[in-house]
């Protein structure tokens, strides 16, 4: 909403500052952080009161996790609240990319919220049917990708950009909806699998958000896109504001999620944030780069796929436990060791992913 102050810039020249995406991104980040810092304790107290026993802890998981019994979940509500407030205040409300990404984020968040609700009320680690959840996610993601395809109305909007090769894109046509939907759903569930230790998921999410905030800004700027020889997608620069809001809300959440966590993100947050990152990657035509920047999420998801496939085919497990962060727990790594080392890996992968912008 603050973007509309630009209309009064002719009378008050200082209001021209609201034209700049960089300024509004910073404002969204500060707003998101302050909102979570201010209302976080109230949200935690209410969730603890309403949930009673909190998130159920798996009996077949690492024994060290039993000490976390009673910790409330659905902390994603804190992040999403800060994200929405920061976005609504600072983003251009007339930009369709903002609303498409926000719709996917909240849609996935609702799916995750319902899953968390069932787990808490039933005191079981099983939410609602995995197939049903996947079907709903696919519908939301496919609808968003269709909207993105129609929004562009040019061959690029239905194409897959290839890293390292300038002016190279694979035209997918209507298959873009399926491919893009797969990216969004895959990203959502990959982040969901990563969220297994205090602070493990939120920092890599923030690192990826900061990276894609930069990618969005560059891809949405004709001058920078031409210089870097990446695909120019008009209007996507505004997505940097959403990334800023997520970064701020994530910092606020980390304050309460740092070990020992006062609240868990839950599926409410992990599905929503993963879906958001996937949608932004599809919008700015950097789907392959998401696999690099979000490589930690890919690793976690692949470890589960390999574990399940190996057990079904051979009756043997590749890892002591999946996702892979539990494997390292079983090997004797402490929780802080795993979390901080995975953060370091995320930083390195983000730098590697950003370096591809200049490799053409």
Curated annotation (Swiss-Prot):
Keyword Cell cycle part of the UniProt annotation: yes
Membrane topology: Multi-pass membrane protein
Residues that span the membrane, as ranges: 25-45, 71-91, 94-114, 129-148, 168-188, 199-219, 239-259, 263-283, 288-308, 337-357
Listed pathway(s): Cell wall biogenesis; peptidoglycan biosynthesis
Keywords tagged on the record: Cell cycle, Cell division, Cell inner membrane, Cell membrane, Cell shape, Cell wall biogenesis/degradation, Magnesium, Membrane, Metal-binding, Peptidoglycan synthesis, Transferase, Transmembrane, Transmembrane helix
Required cofactor(s): Mg(2+)
CC per GO annotation: plasma membrane
Reactions this protein catalyses: UDP-N-acetyl-alpha-D-muramoyl-L-alanyl-gamma-D-glutamyl-meso-2,6-diaminopimeloyl-D-alanyl-D-alanine + di-trans,octa-cis-undecaprenyl phosphate = di-trans,octa-cis-undecaprenyl diphospho-N-acetyl-alpha-D-muramoyl-L-alanyl-D-glutamyl-meso-2,6-diaminopimeloyl-D-alanyl-D-alanine + UMP
EC number: 2.7.8.13
Enzyme class: transferase
Family as reported in the entry's similarity comment: Belongs to the glycosyltransferase 4 family. MraY subfamily.
Functional summary from the UniProt entry: Catalyzes the initial step of the lipid cycle reactions in the biosynthesis of the cell wall peptidoglycan: transfers peptidoglycan precursor phospho-MurNAc-pentapeptide from UDP-MurNAc-pentapeptide onto the lipid carrier undecaprenyl phosphate, yielding undecaprenyl-pyrophosphoryl-MurNAc-pentapeptide, known as lipid I.
Protein name: Phospho-N-acetylmuramoyl-pentapeptide-transferase
Organism: Rhodopseudomonas palustris (strain BisA53)
Gene: mraY
